[in-house]
Amino acid sequence: MSGHSKWATTKHKKAVIDARRGKMFARLIKNIEVAARVGGGDPAGNPTLYDAIQKAKKSSVPNENIERARKRGAGEEAGGADWQTIMYEGYAPNGVAVLIECLTDNRNRAASEVRVAMTRNGGAMADPGSVSYLFSRKGVVTLEKNGLTEDDVLAAVLEAGAEDVNDLGDSFEVISEPGELVAVRSALQDAGIDYESAEAGFQSSVTVPVDVDGARKVFKLVDALEESDDVQNVWTNVDVSDEVLAELDEE
């Protein structure tokens, strides 16, 4: 049940990651606020909120910021925005499919920023449904290896509904149906295995292999999209081989 991950290809390692910390914090805070608004402010009774808080903590978001976001979302503190989730679809260079999830309080601004980022970087917007059919919504739990083998992880999560365990090199990701995400995460906890994040996302059913130049163009487009404060997540169906990734890392 191993194999090259199609999930993490938009998470290409870049030296600019520190410069993006502020944007990453803002995205994590939004997730907490929305989760608390939708499912209530008690993490014990709201698994989505629990996972959003855990991910923020793992990413070193200050506890004060986390708690204020939870309170805003739950209505315990004023100042919460009316966040709306909007999905956009498009194509990157080489026919790579792109799904863009925005979490915004201004639909017009989000649409404009996504369109500009796409067209300036060789991409094109697509009609609703023309790209999304290539993706399935899945639950994904990521965890550092820390001496664990794939069999160790599989033994912990198989009965909980896990579909696949992917070896990402330094870490594993466990794929499941979204409805089994909490069970998989809980199974890891019960086995004493620490995890980095647990969240729902999209996984492609068909992938597009690219060479170094193609990968560079796709990552450039993803970077441009993620520069927008309204863009929460970007998924693609690009397949970047280990050899191509190694070449990119040398640049």
UniProtKB/Swiss-Prot annotation:
Record localization: Cytoplasm
GO MF annotations in UniProt: DNA binding
Keyword Disulfide bond: no
InterPro entries: Integrase-like_N (IPR017856), TACO1_YebC-like_2nd/3rd_dom (IPR048300), TACO1_YebC_N (IPR049083), Transcrip_reg_TACO1-like (IPR002876), Transcrip_reg_TACO1-like_dom3 (IPR026564), YebC-like (IPR029072)
Entry keyword annotation includes DNA-binding: yes
GO cellular component term, pick one: cytosol
Top-level taxon: Bacteria
GO biological process: regulation of DNA-templated transcription
UniProt keyword terms in alphabetical order: Cytoplasm, DNA-binding, Transcription, Transcription regulation
Cystine crosslinks: none
Record's protein name: Probable transcriptional regulatory protein MMAR_2098
